[in-house]
Regions:
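Short Lys/Arg-rich cationic patches that frequently serve as NLS/NoLS or arginine-rich RNA/DNA-binding motifs
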Residues: 1-14, 41-45
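A general secondary-structure signal for short beta-strands and their flanking turns/coil
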Residues: 14-16, 63
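Short, surface-exposed, charged amphipathic helix/loop patches that serve as local interaction elements
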Residues: 32-119
């Protein structure tokens, strides 16, 4: 089968809906609106991990949600995309940025995933 025949038979992949959240400084966080059942299960187990301190579980759960839900993060007009780049940027974020991200993730979970507990 040639390239063109393969391209004709190509079906567009389904994409999860995305939501944009902006802070007062104009920074934007774009989050996915869907999570697989396995991702939901993993999140719950991380959030309630009895072998870790509550604060450790809470921070790990927030990072887990960040990894799974964030599609793009624009900070001072500099876009960051891709899981590795986003996670690296998150790990060097200021306390204020992390607080905003945590609050945004909480609002997003409440709106799109009411069955999940917020970190």
């Amino acid at each position: 089968m040639g390239k063109r025949a393969r391209a004709r038979g190509k079906v567009d992949k389904l994409r999860a809906p995305e939501s944009e959240y902006a802070d007062p400084d104009g920074n934007v966080l774009v989050l996915r609106g869907a999570m697989s059942p396995l991702t939901r299960h993993r999140y719950k187990s991380i959030l309630h991990d009895q072998s870790k301190l509550t604060d450790d579980s809470w921070q790990r759960a927030t990072e887990f949600l960040f990894e799974r839900l964030v599609v793009r993060w624009v900070v001072f007009d500099v876009p960051t995309e891709g899981q590795k780049e986003l996670l690296a940027r998150y790990r060097i974020a200021s306390q204020e940025e992390r607080r905003w991200i945590r609050d945004t993730l909480r609002a997003h979970l409440t709106e799109h995933f009411p069955d999940l507990e917020t970190p």
